[in-house]
């Protein structure tokens, strides 16, 4: 009876491990080795263990994990961190107490910094404080923090409706509404009150940081610090380097990342920096496949089976579809009229379905559920859009879905490296490992491209270009590497 109970529990743990490891096979090999220890004679058990060990050593997963390990250390090397020492970092200010501002405040408080939050009025300030406290209350509820520890942390938090409260802080992070006019108004106030030498950072995702910097009298102090939501949990911090910023300000960004236990990646100024710029492209590839015949649920499943925790349509529902909708409206005037534009997301947003927060998006979230269920009405919207666009739907296998999804990601990754938005391919890899849930055992999109082979990726892109030459334009860097017989790894040497 005891043995039967043991095996039952073992089966349960095996299933649990398989689910948690998301395609990483080494945890299952460990279980197999333990099974061997329980059921085989010693010599056979040792032989099995050796065989399993060699399977792990020879696998591309080992190479992916080792690449990830070294890449996350290599990203700390940037021209500015070599050229300059960071400025002092003893106190911080945050402008904006929404989800992002509060998350950044928690990250700063957890690092031991005193934090001053600025909001428009007392009501918004109270809401900002409540957003900060909610994080700690959640930890108390889980038994991971005591009320006394929370009180000690909150003693370092203060709020004000007057910018004058930021007169002496070493660094300010602006986390207000994503609109240029609003950002410039905030920076005009910071320019007026902050001490000389204070680092003035913006958390914008898409706006031109050079334009923000140019609008004040000290552009040399302005830097982008792009946190990922929830900012107190997500490890990635994109440090965005505008044209006029001084090297010690960039070095201070790296120093802040270290204090906050985050992984910094240096990025150049462009629409979306490294991560969101590439995301916009592979997300379009997903939309094209959806309109061509794959359901959003099939695409999400393929992406999860590749090793991601969530698929792109689940992510959209989690983040809120209204954000992407606003971005698309902002860009509508400058969109290439020849380029393909899938309207499914707009149809869904027009109905007020923004994802989890409205209980409907691509998925249905009954009674505020965290996990969505497929929605037949969404499939009907997609069908109607196919008819409108004159598209005859076809089936996609998981392999076909991932070939397109990854080719789009890799190709735009190559453009980002070519244009020096990312210093090296490994900076793209680290961005995706820490900000976008890319499976660690695959090393990152550029490492994955090397594993598959760049000639194969380029051949895929050229094949897809036959049906859509505007979307599928091979990156000149990818073409050049294939012609030279080189790979992305050859560009990872530090300068």
Regions found by a protein language model. Name each.
Residues 7-495:
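N-terminal glycine-rich phosphate-binding loop for ADP-containing cofactors
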Residues 1-6:
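Positively charged, low-complexity/disordered segments
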């Amino acid at each position: 009876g005891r043995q039967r109970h043991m095996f039952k529990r073992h089966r349960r743990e095996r299933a649990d491990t398989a689910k948690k490891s998301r395609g990483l096979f080494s945890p299952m090999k460990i279980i197999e080795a333990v099974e061997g220890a329980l059921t085989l004679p010693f010599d056979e058990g040792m032989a099995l263990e050796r065989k399993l060990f060699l399977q792990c050593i020879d696998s591309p997963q080992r190479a992916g994990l080792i690449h990830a390990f070294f890449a996350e250390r290599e990203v700390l090397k940037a021209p500015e961190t070599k050229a300059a020492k960071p400025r002092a970092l003893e106190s911080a200010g945050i402008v904006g107490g929404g989800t992002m501002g509060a998350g950044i405040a928690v990250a700063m408080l957890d690092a031991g910094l005193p934090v001053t939050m600025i909001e428009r009025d007392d009501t918004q300030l109270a809401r900002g404080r409540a957003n900060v406290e909610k994080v700690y209350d959640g930890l108390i509820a889980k038994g991971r923090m005591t009320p006394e520890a929370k009180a000690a942390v909150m003693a370092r938090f203060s709020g004000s409706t007057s910018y004058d409260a930021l007169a002496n802080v070493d660094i300010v992070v602006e986390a207000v509404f994503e609109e240029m006019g609003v950002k410039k108004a905030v920076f005009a106030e910071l320019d007026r009150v902050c001490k000389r030498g204070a680092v003035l950072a913006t958390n914008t995702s898409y706006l031109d940081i050079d334009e923000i910097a140019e609008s004040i009298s000290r552009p040399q102090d302005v830097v982008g610090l792009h946190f990922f939501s929830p900012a107190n949990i997500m490890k990635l911090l994109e440090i965005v380097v505008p044209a006029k910023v001084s090297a010690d300000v960039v070095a201070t960004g790296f120093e802040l990342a270290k204090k906050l236990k985050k992984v910094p990646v240096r990025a150049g100024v462009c629409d979306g920096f490294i991560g969101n710029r590439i995301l916009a492209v592979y997300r379009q590839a997903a939309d094209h496949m959806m309109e061509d015949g794959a359901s959003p649920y099939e695409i999400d499943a393929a992406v999860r089976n590749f090793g991601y925790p969530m698929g792109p349509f689940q992510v959209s529902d989690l983040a809120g579809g209204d954000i992407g909708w606003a971005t698309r409206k902002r860009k509508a005037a400058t969109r290439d009229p020849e380029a393909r534009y899938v309207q499914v997301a707009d149809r869904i947003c027009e109905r007020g379905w923004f994802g989890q927060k409205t209980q409907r998006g691509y998925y249905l979230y009954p009674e505020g559920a965290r996990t969505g269920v497929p929605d037949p009405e969404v499939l009907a919207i997609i069908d109607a859009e196919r008819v409108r666009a004159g598209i005859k739907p076809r089936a996609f296998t998981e392999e076909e879905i991932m070939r397109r999804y990854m080719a789009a990601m890799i190709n735009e990754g190559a453009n980002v490296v070519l244009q020096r938005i990312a210093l090296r391919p490994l900076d793209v890899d680290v961005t995706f490992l820490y900000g976008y849930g890319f499976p660690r055992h695959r090393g990152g999109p550029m490492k994955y491209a090397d594993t598959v082979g760049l000639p194969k990726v380029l051949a895929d892109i050229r094949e897809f270009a036959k049906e859509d030459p505007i979307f599928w334009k091979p990156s000149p860097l990818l073409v050049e590497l294939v012609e030279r017989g080189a790979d992305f790894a050859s560009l990872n040497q530090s300068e």
